[in-house]
């Protein structure tokens, strides 16, 4: 009986978490972690339309999250989390950290939009 209750509770929790992925206005998004000289994930796939990118700086240095082709950028200090709402057409978008040579040291990634 306890296994059944635990299984049902786990299923309900999973459904609630998935329901929380879309905003009231139809937005969806991705969370990117910035840490010394890397972004995680290095790439993500999203649907076209309004997307929210949440950037969390888990490192000890200041970073930026820049989508140059859209002219969008946020600066994220250590321990901070910031969001960036963008309208994405199908295509590929590169994101980078523009602090010093962080991009050259590996802080870059790609958003694939279907």
Predicted regions and their residues:
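Sec-dependent bacterial lipoprotein signal peptides
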Residues: 1-20
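Extracellular/periplasmic metallocenter environments
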Residues: 15, 24, 76-114
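Soluble periplasmic/extracytoplasmic beta-strand elements of cell-envelope proteins
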Residues: 31-33, 52-54, 66, 96, ...
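Beta-strand cores of secreted/periplasmic/IMS beta-sandwich domains, seen most often
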Residues: 42-61, 82-96
């Amino acid at each position: 009986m306890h296994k059944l209750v635990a299984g049902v509770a786990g299923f309900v929790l999973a459904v609630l978490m998935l329901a929380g992925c879309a905003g009231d206005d139809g937005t969806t998004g991705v969370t990117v972690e910035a840490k010394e000289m890397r972004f995680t994930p290095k790439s993500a796939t999203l649907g076209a339309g309004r997307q929210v990118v949440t950037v969390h700086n888990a490192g000890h240095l200041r970073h930026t999250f820049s989508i140059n082709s859209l002219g969008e950028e946020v600066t994220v200090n250590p321990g901070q989390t910031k969001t960036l709402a963008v309208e994405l057409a199908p295509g590929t978008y590169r994101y980078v950290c523009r602090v010093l040579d962080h991009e050259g040291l590996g802080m870059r990634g790609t958003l694939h939009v279907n």
